[in-house]
Structure formats: C-alpha cells, structure tokens
C-alpha cells in the first residue's frame, strides 16, 4: 500500500514538471504494438478450445496486427484531416521483441532468448509485410512509434514456472504464448515485465532497457524516442538505471 502511494506521488511530481498546455488536444495512443499475446492463427483454435470462455478481453482479441488490420487502420486515418490538412497520428507504444520459444525450450528453460518483433511478424500468417506498412505509415506521418519495453513477459518468473513444471504454462508455451487466464502459483502478473520475483539480478532490469532500446533505435533508423513511464518507477539501487539509459538514448532528456 505504502509503495503504491509512493509511486503515485512520484508519478504526479514527474508529470507536474512536464510540458502543459491549455489547448484541447486529443491523443491517440495504443499499447503493446509488436508484442504477441495470442498464438498465431494456425494455433488459435487449439488455444480457444483450451480456454473457451476467458473473462479477460485481451485473451479474446489481443494479437499482432495483420497486413489487413493495418491497411484498414491507416486507410481510415488517411481519410481524416483537420482544418490545417493534418492527418491524425497514432502513437504506437512498441514492444520490440518476443520470446524465441524454440531456443528457450532447447535450453531446458534455463536460458532466455528473444527475437526482434520484426522476425516474429515474418513467421505469423498474413504478417510478412506488416512492418513495411509500419515504415510507410511513419513516412506518411500517420504513426509515431514509442518505446514501451523489450518484451511483455516477466522473464525470470516465467522461466522459473516452466522449470518447476507449471503444466498450464507449459501447454501454453507449446502453442507459442505465455498468456493463460490465471497463473495461480504466483501473485505477480506474467505480463508485468519488471515486477519483482524474489531477488531479481540487478543486470536483468538494465539488460531489459539497454537491449530493448537498442532494438528500438535500430528499427527506427537511429531516431531517438522517449521511454515509457512503465520503466521509470523502480526502487532502491535500481533507480539509476532508467536515468542512465535515458541519457544514452534520448538526446532531449533532462533531469
């Protein structure tokens, strides 16, 4: 309770120091672009047989945007303009990597491996050209990518559960996902990439940010974008990590 209150106060203080305006602005911002949640369409029916009535809407609809999805979305945005001739621009809060399930399994769930989300897109049905549509939308100022995280799974917790024989997570793993309606063996949400599990190594959080931002900078051809607030709120000795990484990758960063 006290920790949550502390984080809320810190968030408000950070926002108070930020930019403000009296203009009425509509912000189009959407999370988790690039991250898998549901399996590829080739395995989705098996997944839905296993979990036929999930209460969580993300387990019904949350998946990578296909070429058809993106074409419809960007076509809709292109048809809309303000009185200055500007299109709406969507902020894609981007997750830059997904687990490499094959390599993780080969290691006996002892080592974590990831692949850039652009490689994931190539493997998913009807997604091979999706990233080209991203790049076109960036060039046409229909979309603006922003770093949201390396991957959207709590890696230390997930691997520990797999090594301990959590059958539900092992079954989901074979379908190419970690998402199950409820992981009853832990109070930590598997989606919460940076939540604590026992004593996580100091290097895990630093690697998460360093490697994630490196992938992000590479995929947007060297641009420098902002870090999402989800990686800012850490306690104790880890407080310096976001500052260090932000200064390295965001040329406009100020304390």
PLM features: residue spans?
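Catalytic alpha-helical scaffold of carbohydrate-active enzymes acting on polysaccharides/glycoconjugates
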Residues: 2-255
């Amino acid at each position: 309770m006290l920790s949550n209150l502390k984080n809320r106060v810190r968030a408000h203080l950070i926002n108070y120091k930020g930019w403000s305006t009296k203009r009425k602005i509509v912000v189009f911002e959407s999370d988790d672009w690039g991250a898998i949640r549901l399996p590829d369409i080739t395995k989705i029916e098996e997944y839905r047989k296993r979990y036929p009535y999930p209460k969580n809407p993300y387990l019904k609809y949350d998946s990578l945007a296909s070429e058809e999805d993106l074409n419809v979305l960007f076509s809709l945005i292109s048809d809309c303009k303000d009185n200055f001739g500007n299109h709406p621009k969507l902020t894609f809060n981007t997750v830059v990597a997904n687990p490499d399930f094959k390599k993780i399994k080969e290691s006996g769930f002892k080592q974590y491996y990831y692949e850039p989300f652009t490689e994931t897109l190539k493997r998913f049905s009807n997604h091979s050209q999706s990233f080209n549509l991203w790049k076109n939308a960036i060039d046409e100022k229909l979309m603006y990518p922003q770093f949201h995280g390396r991957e959207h799974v709590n890696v230390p917790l997930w691997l520990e559960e797999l090594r301990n024989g959590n059958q539900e997570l092992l079954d989901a793993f074979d379908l190419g996902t970690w998402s199950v309606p409820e992981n009853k063996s832990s109070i930590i949400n598997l989606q919460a990439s940076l939540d604590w599990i026992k004593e996580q190594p100091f290097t895990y959080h630093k690697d998460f940010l360093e490697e994630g931002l490196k992938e992000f900078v590479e995929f947007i051809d060297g641009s420098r974008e902002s870090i999402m607030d989800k990686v800012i709120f850490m306690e104790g000795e880890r407080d310096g990590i976001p500052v260090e990484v932000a200064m390295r990758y965001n040329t406009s960063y100020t304390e």
